[in-house]
Amino acid sequence: MMLSLRRFSMYVLRSLRLHFKKIIITLLTIQLLFITIFVLGGRSSIIDGNWKSFMALFFKPLAYTNRNNNHASFDLRSKDNVAKLYEKMNFDTSGKWIDTYTLKNNLLTVKMGPEKGQVLDSVDELRYYDNDPRLVWSVLLDHLLESDSNEYAFSWYDWANFDSTNKLIALRHTNISCQFVCEGAFDKNVLEMVESEVQEPLFVTNRNKYDESLWYNRVRKVVDSNSVQQAIHDHCMNNDAYSNGTPFELPFIISEISERLRPEVYDLQAKNHLLYSNFTPLSLTVLDSDKDAYRINLKTTDSSKSNIVQTNLLQNYIKRHRNEMVNGDLIFNHTSMFEKFLHHGSTKKRKLDVEALDKTIYAGEYLELSPSDFQFNAKERIIELETRLRSEGLPSHDTHYLRSLKTSVNTSPALQQKYFAEASDITDATADGHHRDRRFFSIGHNLLNDPQEFEARLNSLIRNFQKFVKANGLISWLSHGTLYGYLYDGLKFPWDVDHDLQMPIKHLHYLSQYFNQSLILEDPREGNGRFLLDVGSAITVGVHGNGENNIDARFIDIDSGIYIDITGLSVSSDAAKQYMSKFVEEESSGESFSALIEDYKFDENDYFDEVDGREGLAKYTIHELMEWVNSHPDDFTDAEKNLVTKTYKKELAISRSDYAEKDLSPKQRYLVNEKYNLYNCRNQHFSSLNIISPLRNTMFSGVSAFVPNRPIATLNNEYKVPAKYGLLSFQGKVYLPEFRYWFSFADMKKFANLQLKEPKITRLESPLNDLKFSDISLLITNILKCGFHSVFASLFNSFDSTVYRLKELEIQYDPSLSEEEKSSLLKTLRRGMSKKIKSPEKDPIIYIYERKLWENVEKLLNASNIYNIASQVEKEKGKEFVERSQQVYERNFDGFRLPDGGNSKTVNDLNSKGLNLFGDNKKTSNNIFGSDQKY
């Protein structure tokens, strides 16, 4: 495509200005050269041959020293700074940034492309920018404080990650067409032209594969030209605004994400589609840690034309803060601005307080639930909202919720279409596309290959969801694999790629009414998480139906597409199947299920509607619906017929099974479930009220969380939990209780030298199931020698979380303690230690930022210097880890000396309380997971 005359003119003018600046800089450098020679005489002259020391005078980077009142950048050649960066990148999980973000050093300095290194004169010259949270938060908060309005023009460009698309905007000479992003894998020639011009790789994850000829030929061989042309025709068009030189525009517009793409291609399509789609959140929900939340309403605007430059918010910010400039530069201090926002008078009107919710529920040790929490009257809620709509109007969230309710009640469970869309059609299975939201799929910086980056994402997800529900008084608890992982060390299993939580149906509806389609923003003092709360369209349906909508809601990380699955539990007519007899007999003091049913009177003539207010086909039983479909075949698509048939066959299978409920109708099943407090999600996971309630207050990933009253019973309904707490192996992982950590067995064979194949690694002499304390120090040394840096970082950073869970287990399962003693000790532990637990993983955005800085260090310093610096940092951290572990082993850990709740001067020492699961975990009596304990 030929450059337009306007673009060409702009390019010529910029080039002339750039060359003019270079001439001036060259003249100044020559002048400085002669001055230096004159001043230094023979000490550092070219004539003496000391060229390196002489040139160092000119090329020494800026350090933190602040000369002439300039805001200095971070010096990556300073060994002290490199050590500081390595320590911060691996062992500091706080929300603090390693440097400051400024107007000149960051925003106006061109980072890539032909003009790399040039400092622009004004933000009006920006064609793209990195949406660093410090920049966006500062501008947004300043706008809200200066404006009477609580509205804000939203753009995905300011909140999601557009690093790769910015590289396409930065291009001046290389023309990119739809074909580049519609082929299953990138054309290497075009890819290299792009990277040559921007002077950076377009992506990092598996970029090296494109340089392997066998791999490249294989993935390109499957590219079918006809399919590509069809994909271009159906899903992609060239962007005239880009051709005309309009800033922030991409060369093409994706109308729909294609199928069968490699992750890096899918990533680029998904980002493009997100930017140009009509889909935007209804609001922003800003967290004040886990204490409060604030609502910012969003204007209905074109996301691709509403970023902080296009709407002049950035320009206005600079004008208002011009008096803070130093030599034309300006610091964006977002945390200071956030503090100002929290304490400003106008912020009170933005505070979220849902009348039906109680924000104090997380203050106690227990939370009692009632049967009413698991029931919901859709018809009543619809009437209430429609009455308000007619009399006073409804806020956008209520309007959206009302629409969802009506859609749900009037759609048969057998005809519900799948709501959530995953990136399941990605051609690389390692991308876990089936566990990623299609709209937000991203390969991140190196998400598929860097375990620290991946675990940081999952950790940020669960921590922020828990802070979100606590700040608003919403009830949820850990479930499925997430609960199972918590059981051992207070963390997720390392093989899990998402999280699972459950809610009572009443609170699922609060979640939907007040927060559906809100972008949840983490407290910027603690991190930089951005998550879309998305509730599905089947929120009044409690039965499995056609199985297409087992998940009620998702909490989605918009920078990766990784999510939390949220399911609501309610009374329904689903069959509990193999669990029914067990649940009912437990609730009924041992009476058999058949005897109970025999005495229970059902009147099948009474009208029964599981969801009150349904109309049309939604009112039909599955038998009636199947009959209707068969008699009106032209009214249904083949897909709809298949869904109804599938649902019908499932119902028939129950009547032909040996389940206790095989002779019960849906109405009878509903009444039995209601009578005996049996609740289920749409994925047919059943539980009873006394297994769930009272919920227990605990810590998970370093933040408050609820778990069911009887976690072992809950898990044994789904898994088979080994009774013993000790050495375990599963899916190639090994749990070592001395470390409270799941190691890869392949890694362990190396750092324990189990097969004597590592001559430089001291062999572990003790068997894995009988480690001595001295083995801990040896294994830490070996882990570092073997280069398992991310493993050690994870061990170090999760120490607080895992020792908290260790002490919790020791108290909960000590048979010598009474229920009252356990309750008192657990209360002391939680209230005294919870606020001191650091996050077990880094904030992912800060980690990626520091990771990129470190990659620059690797280009600047030789490998030997880097190794020495990193080794010294890790040696000190390894020593600290062993010392803290020894304190726990000797039951002398400072962290377990906690203040008394009523008297801050009185110290409760919990070291000696409870079992000794660390120093004595080999006992056969440590079968603590054989059953639930009362506490």
Swiss-Prot record:
Transmembrane intervals: 22-42
Biological function: Plays a role in N-glycan mannosylphosphorylation and has partially redundant function with MNN4.
Lumenal side: 43-935
InterPro entries reported in the protein's UniProt record: FKTN-rel (IPR009644), LicD/FKTN/FKRP_NTP_transf (IPR007074)
GO biological process: N-glycan processing; protein glycosylation
Applications: Mannosylphosphorylated glycans are found only in fungi, including yeast, and the elimination of mannosylphosphates from glycans is a prerequisite for yeast glycoengineering to produce human-compatible glycoproteins.
Membrane-side (Cytoplasmic) residue stretches: 1-21
A cellular-component GO term for this protein: Golgi membrane
UniProt similarity note: Belongs to the MNN4 family.
Protein species of origin: Saccharomyces cerevisiae (strain ATCC 204508 / S288c) (Baker's yeast)
Disruption phenotype: Eliminates N-glycan mannosylphosphorylation, when its paralog MNN4 is also deleted.
Gene: MNN14
Membrane topology: Single-pass type II membrane protein
Protein name (Swiss-Prot/TrEMBL): Mannosyltransferase regulator 14
Keyword Protein biosynthesis: no
Domain notes from UniProt: The conserved DXD motif is essential for the function, which could be an indication that MNN14 has transferase activity.
Primary location group: Golgi
Keyword annotations from UniProtKB, A to Z: Golgi apparatus, Membrane, Signal-anchor, Transmembrane, Transmembrane helix
Induction of expression: Expression is repressed by RIM101.
